[in-house]
């Protein structure tokens, strides 16, 4: 069982299938299934999409590196693009009803609530999502569900106001 694995993908959304296969193989090796698997696939896929579209500006001459690293308390997936990076703190909170309805920020929000820790490095060129497998429990699951419900509820309110 390898502790670290890497895949380098072309900066094209069609590479999503290779990414999901990479994640599936890792999850199979480590017996990770059910809802936690869905959290991993959704958040890592969203980070990949952001890297293709926003980081590399759909330039298929560029690559995206996906690293899998095992730590003592879980593991991380880190997605690195070849773009200029971005300031994570400038992304609007999509759950704040005072923010105008925008398409941006929702993916980062999903990456954040579906992982146990989201961190941006490399001036925003690398997004790392940590999953604390040792800490899978009802409390953590309830916290995620409540955040998602609050987001969905605020989105429904905003939609009904228009």
What residue spans do the PLM features occupy?
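Conserved short strand/loop->alpha-helix "switch" segment adjacent to the catalytic nucleotide/phosphoryl-transfer site
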Residues: 21-45, 100-101
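Conserved beta-strand-loop-beta-strand hairpin that lines the nucleotide-binding pocket
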Residues: 1-6, 52-162
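Conserved catalytic/ATP-binding subdomain
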Residues: 14, 35-38, 62
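Hydrophobic residues in the alpha-helical elements that line and stabilize the ATP-binding pocket
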Residues: 47, 51
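STAS-typified acidic loop motif
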Residues: 6-17
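Long, highly charged amphipathic alpha-helices
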Residues: 18-22, 113
């Amino acid at each position: 069982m390898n502790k670290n694995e890497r895949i380098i993908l072309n900066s094209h959304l069609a590479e999503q299938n290779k990414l999901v296969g990479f994640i599936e193989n890792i999850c199979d090796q480590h017996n990770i299934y059910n809802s936690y698997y869905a959290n991993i696939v959704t958040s890592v896929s969203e980070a990949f999409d952001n890297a293709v579209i926003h980081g590399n500006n759909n330039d298929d001459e560029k690559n995206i590196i996906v690293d899998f690293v095992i730590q003592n308390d879980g593991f991380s997936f880190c997605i690195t693009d070849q773009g200029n990076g971005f300031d994570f703190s400038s992304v609007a909170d999509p759950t704040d009803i005072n923010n105008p309805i925008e398409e941006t920020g929702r993916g980062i929000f999903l990456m954040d609530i579906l992982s146990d820790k989201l961190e941006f490095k490399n001036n925003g060129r690398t997004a790392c999502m940590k999953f604390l497998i040792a800490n899978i429990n009802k409390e953590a699951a309830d916290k995620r569900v409540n955040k998602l419900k609050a987001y969905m509820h605020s989105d429904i309110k905003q939609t009904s106001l228009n």
